[in-house]
Amino acid sequence: MNDLRYPIGQFTYKRPITEEMIDTWIQEIEDLPNELTKAIKDLDQKQLDTPYRVGGWTVRQVVHHVVDSHMNSYIRFKLALTEKNPTIKPYKEEKWAELPDSKLPVDVSLVMLESLHKRWVNLLYSLELEDLEKTFNHPDTGETKLAAAIGLYAWHGRHHTAHITSLRKRLNW
């Protein structure tokens, strides 16, 4: 049986990272607001409040989480571009998913995601090769180059979109 937590597999990439890989990843980040919107199209409130797996987040929580995560990533990129290997602040995703704003209509987060990704993609397309080598330090996972972080967040968006699309397929929605 497939691992419902990782419907597209865990994040991996081949090295070295090429300009073509970066361009593909940025395009995936740019496409995410539309892809996520399509994934939840025509779902009713009961469906939005259905966990994508036993013990997992609801579809609604997944949508809000993507925005929380990508806001954090955008800030991490800006820190890495303006400071030398800054140590970023992790956050407790599972606790954020329980806060009251995670019960808001998904449209609230979809609007945020659209705006956030316009700014983030603009920033990403402006990066020079030397910028892609800049890093931030995560207290738990260590140093991350911006080039790899672009791939990670492209995967992250596809990963959570697949949580929703695979749930829809399993339940024939």
From Swiss-Prot:
The UniProt record gives the binding positions of Zn(2+) as: H65, H156, H160
Q: What is its main location?
A: cytoplasm
Domain of life assignment: Bacteria
Cofactor requirement: Zn(2+)
Query: What are the entry keywords?
Result: Cytoplasm, Hydrolase, Metal-binding, Zinc
Report the cofactor remark.
Binds 1 zinc ion per subunit.
Gene3D superfamilies with a match to the protein in the record: dinb family like domain
> In the record, what terms sit under GO molecular function?
hydrolase activity; zinc ion binding
Cross-referenced InterPro entries: DinB-like (IPR024775), DinB/YfiT-like (IPR034660), Put_metal_dep_hydrolase_YfiT (IPR023774)
Q: What is its EC number?
A: 3.-.-.-
Q: Where in the cell is it found?
A: Cytoplasm
What GO cellular-component annotations does this UniProt entry give?
cytoplasm
NCBIfam families, alphabetized:
PRK13291.1
Family that this chain belongs to: Belongs to the metal hydrolase YfiT family.
Query: Subunit details for this protein?
Result: Homodimer.
Its annotated function is as follows: Possible metal-dependent hydrolase.
Q: Protein name, please?
A: Putative metal-dependent hydrolase BA_2700/GBAA_2700/BAS2515
Question: What species is given as this protein's source?
Answer: Bacillus anthracis
Lineage per the UniProt record: Bacteria, Bacillati, Bacillota, Bacilli, Bacillales
